[in-house]
């Protein structure tokens, strides 16, 4: 189970925009990630590639400071607020909860929950 400092370090890295690096540092080799209502995808290498593809689709992705989390045993829930800017200059804000199960110091399962009405049409 992670300590509060370990989860805080993840939050700090994501708030600095180091998304790909955070997966390498904090996710287990066999980790799975599941978007809102989608099937899970797995393996740290695939998660890194998925993150790179998401970042390549946008001009920028910013995590707003002030993310909060709850930690209970090996479960952490983090409230994230992101601003995605498309390559045409338009942007949208998205709030989500990330429910994580940790094994020791690494995330083994993560599932995202958000209101899809936040997403622009066609996303």
Language model features with spans:
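Short, aromatic-enriched amphipathic alpha-helices that serve as compact interaction elements
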Residues: 1-18, 26
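A solvent-exposed, acidic/Ser-Thr-rich amphipathic alpha-helical stretch
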Residues: 5, 20-74
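Short beta-strand segments enriched in hydrophobic/aromatic residues
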Residues: 27, 82-84, 98, 114
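Residue-level signal for well-ordered, solvent-exposed loop/turn and beta-edge residues enriched
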Residues: 32, 90, 106-108
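A short, polar/proline- and glycine-enriched secondary-structure boundary/capping micro-motif
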Residues: 45, 88-90, 119-123
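Hydrophobic/aromatic beta-strand elements that line small-molecule binding cavities or substrate pockets
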Residues: 51, 64-69, 82, 95-101
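Short, cysteine-centered beta-strand-loop-beta hairpins and adjacent loop/turn segments enriched
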Residues: 60, 83-93
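Short beta-strand edge/turn micro-motifs at domain boundaries
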Residues: 95-121
């Amino acid at each position: 189970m992670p300590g509060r400092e370990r989860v805080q370090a993840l939050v700090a890295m994501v708030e600095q925009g180091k998304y790909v690096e955070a997966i390498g540092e904090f996710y287990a080799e066999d980790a799975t990630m599941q978007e809102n209502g989608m099937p899970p995808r797995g393996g740290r290498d695939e998660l890194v590639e998925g993150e790179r593809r998401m970042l390549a689709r946008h001009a920028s992705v910013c995590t707003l400071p002030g993310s909060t989390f709850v930690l209970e045993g090996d479960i952490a829930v983090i409230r994230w607020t992101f601003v995605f800017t498309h390559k045409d200059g338009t942007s949208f804000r998205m709030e989500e909860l990330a429910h994580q199960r940790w094994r020791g110091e690494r995330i083994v399962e993560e599932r995202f929950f958000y209101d899809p009405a936040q997403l622009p049409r066609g996303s």
